[in-house]
Design a protein with these regions (language model features):
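C-terminal cap/loop subdomain of S1 sulfatases and analogous C-terminal strand-loop tails that border
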Residues: 7-16, 20-99, 103, 138
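Active-site oxyanion-binding pockets that recognize sulfate/phosphate
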Residues: 10-13, 110, 114
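Non-transmembrane alpha-helical segments in soluble domains
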Residues: 24-28, 47, 51, 111-114, ...
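Basic/polar N-terminal segments that are highly enriched at the extreme N-terminus
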Residues: 51, 143-146
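Bilobed periplasmic-binding protein-like "clamshell/Venus-flytrap" ligand-binding domains
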Residues: 56-59, 130-144
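Residue-level structural signal for beta-strand termini and adjacent loop
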Residues: 84-85, 113-115
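Intrinsically disordered, low-complexity polar regions and short flexible loop motifs
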Residues: 106
Length: 146
């Protein structure tokens, strides 16, 4: 994400997680617009990141393909649970042994460090369980157009 407003945003680079879901919350706060409190808002307010280059409040990100959880990002780690090439026509592959990468040291995701990081895997497993417990399945507006 690249944002520029020298009157409001401190110039610099933050190498943390930020998603498009954070834009609604952040821009609402910047415009002094109240965030709805009658529903769960997935995005985080990134104003402190923009103003002081502090760490992002977003530590986790869930990669979905439709309703399928494909991968999970936790801090600098990314765990792939399933693989699916978007246009090759092959079925989705559920990995017997997931792929774990440290994106700080391996941004190209070439070296699977799954076997050497059981503590990270335990933490990501906790994150997945909490996420699935908190998840509210919404109607798929692209499929359920009836």
């Amino acid at each position: 994400m690249c944002i520029r407003d020298r009157s409001y945003i401190k110039p610099g680079i933050v190498d943390d997680i930020g998603t498009s879901m954070d834009l609604f919350t952040t821009f609402s706060h910047m415009a002094d617009v109240a965030i709805p409190n009658d529903r769960i808002i997935d995005g985080n307010n990134l104003i402190s990141v923009f103003k002081s280059l502090s760490k992002s409040p977003t530590e986790n990100f869930f990669y979905y393909w439709g309703a399928e959880l494909m991968a999970v990002r936790y801090k600098s780690y990314k765990l792939h649970l399933k693989l699916h090439e978007a246009y090759d026509g092959k079925p989705m592959e559920v990995l017997k042994t997931p792929f774990l990468y440290n994106l700080d040291t391996d941004p190209s995701e070439k070296n699977n460090i799954y076997e050497d990081n059981l503590d990270v895997l335990d933490k990501i497993d906790e994150i997945i369980k909490k996420h699935k417990n908190d998840l509210i399945i919404a109607k798929d507006l692209l499929i359920d157009l009836k």
